[in-house]
């Protein structure tokens, strides 16, 4: 836990969680603070000058969830998905920049593909992982390797035998 003087710039709501975005005196930069993690707020009554170049829409343009800003570089991401997931992504895109690749660009095995220009934030990676084996990252290679490391970590976790005699709470 730490204290900072925060000059508030905007509030972001994502996945039912509120984020307070502002200039943090401790960090000297714009930061996002999940409201559920803020232990105490005190209004100092001080005035501050809002940065002229801050625009909330631009700050979050390439992200999903609560992460935003220049720390997270946007990359062009291509995924191949099952037909079931494709139907879902057509109705609820992963990101506003999402476009379905035309038939001439279909994956070798005929799976539908989608492209998007998005920041590779932890919440975006978690969203991709939530589709399990029904979504494959084709590009960029760095994201593909990250997904493989996460898959290996899951395999290691679940390969460890646990007693089936454990009693679960009712």
Task: Describe the predicted segments one by one.
Residues 61-170:
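Polybasic (Lys/Arg-rich)
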Residues 1-78, 83, 169:
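Core beta-strand-centered patch of the WYL/Sm-like small regulatory domain
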């Amino acid at each position: 836990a730490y204290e900072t003087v925060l000059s508030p710039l905007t509030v972001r709501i994502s996945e039912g969680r509120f984020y307070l975005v502002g200039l943090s005196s401790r960090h000297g930069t714009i930061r996002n603070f999940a409201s559920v993690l803020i232990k105490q707020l005190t209004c100092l009554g001080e005035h501050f000058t809002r940065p002229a170049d801050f625009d909330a829409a631009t700050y979050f343009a390439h992200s999903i969830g609560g992460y935003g800003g220049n720390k997270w570089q946007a990359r062009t991401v291509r995924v191949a998905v099952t037909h079931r997931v494709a139907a879902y992504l057509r109705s609820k895109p992963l990101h506003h920049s999402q476009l379905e690749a035309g038939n001439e660009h279909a994956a070798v095995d005929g799976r539908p593909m989608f492209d998007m220009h998005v920041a590779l934030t932890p919440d975006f990676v978690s969203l991709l992982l939530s589709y399990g084996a029904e979504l494959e990252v084709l590009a960029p290679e760095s994201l593909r390797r990250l997904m493989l490391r996460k898959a290996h970590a899951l395999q290691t976790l679940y390969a460890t035998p646990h007693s089936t005699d454990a009693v679960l709470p009712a």
